[in-house]
Amino acid sequence: MGVPSSGQVSINNIVSEFGGTEPHQLSEYYRDGGSVPGNNTNVPTSGEIKLSDFYGAVNSVVVTLSAPATNVELSSTFGSDWTSTIPKVLNIDSGVIIGATNFNYALRVSTGMAGTIEINNAGSIQGKGGSPIGQKGFHPGNRGNQTPPRAGSGGDGGPAISIVSAGATINNTGTISGGGGAGGGGGAGQRGQTINGRWKGGDGGWGGLGEGYNQARTTGTAGQRNQAYALSRGGDGGPGGYFGAAGSTGSTGGQARFKAPSSSAGLGGFGGAAGSAIKNDGATWTNGTTTGTYQGSY
């Protein structure tokens, strides 16, 4: 509720807001002295202190994010108050996007927090979408190994919120979205063989991108047809996942018209995992209001 912002202020108003031990005296209530948080800048840290210094003082640190931001580290946002037991409140305004440019988090409840934090999200918190991290399916050489290796997997999507410290309550009336996983690469086509020798099949396609902050979801690229003697086509890359969804496995390569002995088409790569809306990275949390949208586990 806070101390009155005008009119008469008594020691009882201050005790009601900040607590303390009897007998009460104003010297208990210096700013950053353990009872009064640093956001109450009118309250001195030492020296003369008077009742009127406490007009509008509140026993919590409130930060509001009203503009877009990326990779928000709450220990930096709250500064020295992060390691204080003073309650903390983070408000994210409607229409504000908090995004991830790395695969770790868009917003992180950092290590070392003391006390509690209440996160009130009315905006949109978006994890990073996955990218293909391995090769599309291919044959290492024109002749040699009969069966190509499995195509590379798609990268995982990143979480929207990472929880490292306990004591967080998350109220969501907006949207919290983990990144989508990338699609796996398409498998290489089966080797062919004719009287002229063995011939490699076509390369597989690349996996698609997962949906994420500043990244649209894409489908995989098509597999290629290679040597005329093989007449086998590489498999298509798997499409990336939407926000909070896994990428798809790439397609297996096609069969050759004239198959080389003991040869098989290459397998498609696995799709990347979905990013969590809220992820336990060492600590649990409490879901408060959940009337908003979640894309990914929470």
Q: In which residue ranges do the predicted regions lie?
A:
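Glycine-centric low-complexity repeats
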Residues: 2-298
